[in-house]
Amino acid sequence: MSLPALQNSAVFYRRIINRFPQDFSLAFAYGSAVFRQTGSSQGHMVKNMLDFVFAVDDPVTWHTMNLIENRKHYSFLRFLGPKQISSIQSDYGAGVYFNTLVPAEDRLIKYGVISTDALIDDLLHWKTLYVAGRLHKPVRILLQSENGNLRSALLGNLKSAVIASFLMLPESFSEEELYLQIAGLSYSGDFRMVFGEDKSKVSNIVKDNMQHFRQLYNRILQECPQVVYKPQQGRLEVDKSPEGQFTQLMALPRTLQQQITRLVDRPGKNRDVEEILLQVAQDPDCGSVVQQGISSIVKSSSITQSAKGIATAGLVKTVSYSTKKLQKMWRGWRRKPA
């Protein structure tokens, strides 16, 4: 499955991508410099840092080549060599290694490297919801291999986002409410939303990008047996019966199911997952339990990945990057009506 992507500026993005070793299974750009957000002008978009994620089959080989071609992108960790860099990438945080504040084509970029296997694992099971969460929202796909497992996982991740959102929404809701819920999944529990991010970030992402969200989710909603989708009215109705919610809970990614069982199961009872989810399906607070489960995943990965980012970026870049984030948060605060 190829996610929808904007077609303009193809040459610009190609020039940036060509600066790197080309062994990508997936390369995409995301964020406020790629998709306009409410309250940001074209001028702000051009000034914003461009964010990329590169999935690669062999991180050691990729970092080896990138250290030859782009050694200055790395912090002091470059002196450890590609094997140690790859170990830091895979063993800590969310399995992503970021280089930030990199000059390219008269812009500043940040790029994260993740192994294809780790990406597929996150897409299918929501182990960290770090990259999987970014892919719940519209992104610009730059390169995508023919890896069938990856394509299937990308689609599965979108379906999981829809199902999880159904569980947290009322019986009837608007298309915009659904996309707000989906866009907010990967920010739920993220400590950076308390300090360092614009508090209206989720709304800003959705308001100006409804058409991109429709492109991403329309077919899934049309084919989903759990929902009545009325695209002309922009309304949806979902099955909120215990049976319907149980079916949805059983379709959630494995890590989220495990988090839910930890929240609900009493110590020492050791009931199986199916029994616990059946109990949750009958609970009036089912949606709240799902929300807490997602928050626990995101909170853990956001803290550990941010801590790793201090080492991978280096102190000077960390201070500079954090300052830029705080400036964006300040602009968002100033835009709010009194």
Swiss-Prot record:
Keywords: Lipid biosynthesis, Lipid metabolism, Magnesium, Membrane, Mitochondrion, Mitochondrion inner membrane, Nucleotidyltransferase, Phospholipid biosynthesis, Phospholipid metabolism, Transferase. It catalyses: a 1,2-diacyl-sn-glycero-3-phosphate + CTP + H(+) = a CDP-1,2-diacyl-sn-glycerol + diphosphate. One of its GO terms (biological process) is CDP-diacylglycerol biosynthetic process. Pfam families: Tam41_Mmp37. InterPro entries: Tam41. It comes from the Eukaryota. GO terms for cellular component: mitochondrial inner membrane; mitochondrion. Pathway: Phospholipid metabolism; CDP-diacylglycerol biosynthesis; CDP-diacylglycerol from sn-glycerol 3-phosphate: step 3/3. Its EC number is 2.7.7.41. Its cofactor is Mg(2+). It is found in: Mitochondrion inner membrane. It is a peripheral membrane protein. GO terms for molecular function: phosphatidate cytidylyltransferase activity. Catalyzes the conversion of phosphatidic acid (PA) to CDP-diacylglycerol (CDP-DAG), an essential intermediate in the synthesis of phosphatidylglycerol, cardiolipin and phosphatidylinositol. Belongs to the TAM41 family. This is Phosphatidate cytidylyltransferase, mitochondrial. It comes from Danio rerio (Zebrafish). The lineage of its organism: Eukaryota, Metazoa, Chordata, Craniata, Vertebrata. The gene is tamm41.
